[in-house]
């Protein structure tokens, strides 16, 4: 949030967002970032950022409890159950364009952040196809489900998929097989530039899109100089992406 305030003070209106190795996280974090990046008008009027599509039973339960199925842009985030109390009031950058660096390691909440901003902001995707995890889950522990936790369940937990998310246009851009890049570029381990180096292939492409000039003869290509390097085969284990939503009180209280 402090960096957002700094960017706002400096008049930043385009951002390179590197989510290549981000497998997801909490919906709260996703909404904090989105509310910093989205147009000020969308945030001040609390427009819909994303909505959850549950089965009929959960949808009816939410409605009976008067709880919304929508996540809206906001500036105040108060969630004592996870010790979050933050404000983005002075950190709305109001980006005109986002260059999203993506790859197979981008999943779940990171895909949802980009997809949720697409109806409001120009999102340009650079890299390779993302993982394609379009579900939202609840992280359940025995302590949350029982008044008195049995000893054999002390270290027990389960991550349950409960919904599919959609953006304000009713779309899930990463469904079914991941976000498709506007510009397809593979990471090049042979060149081995540090993340953040302006010559690293994906960042270089984003900066050129933003107007940065590079010498036509290439800047320090390392491929020829390092013939002994060889890329490892891709990891075959499925990525465990996360998009975690806080469990509504009516669910945890009902189960106890």
For each predicted feature, which ranges?
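C-terminal "post-core" interaction segments
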Residues: 1-14, 19, 23-256
């Amino acid at each position: 949030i402090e960096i957002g305030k700094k960017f706002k003070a400096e008049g930043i209106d385009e951002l390179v967002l590197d989510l290549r190795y981000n497998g997801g996280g909490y919906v709260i974090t996703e909404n904090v970032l989105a509310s910093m990046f989205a147009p000020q008008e969308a945030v001040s009027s609390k427009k819909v950022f994303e909505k959850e599509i549950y089965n009929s039973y959960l949808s009816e339960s939410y409605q009976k409890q008067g709880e919304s199925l929508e996540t809206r842009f906001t500036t105040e985030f108060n969630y004592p159950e996870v010790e979050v109390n933050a404000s983005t009031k002075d950190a709305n950058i109001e980006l005109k364009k986002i260059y999203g660096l993506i790859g197979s390691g981008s999943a779940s909440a990171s895909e949802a952040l980009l997809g949720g901003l697409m109806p409001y902001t120009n999102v340009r995707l650079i890299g390779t196809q993302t993982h394609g995890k379009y579900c939202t889950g609840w992280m359940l522990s025995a302590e949350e489900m029982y008044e008195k936790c049995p000893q054999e369940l002390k270290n027990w937990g389960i991550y349950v998929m409960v919904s599919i998310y959609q953006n304000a246009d009713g779309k899930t851009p990463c469904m079914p097989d991941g976000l498709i890049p506007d510009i397809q570029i593979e990471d090049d381990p042979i060149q081995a530039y540090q993340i953040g180096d302006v010559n690293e292939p994906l960042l270089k492409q984003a900066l050129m899109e933003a107007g940065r000039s590079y010498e036509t003869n290439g800047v320090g290509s390392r491929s020829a100089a390092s013939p002994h390097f060889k890329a490892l085969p891709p990891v075959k284990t499925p990525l465990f992406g996360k998009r975690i939503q806080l469990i509504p009180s009516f669910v945890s209280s009902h189960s106890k």
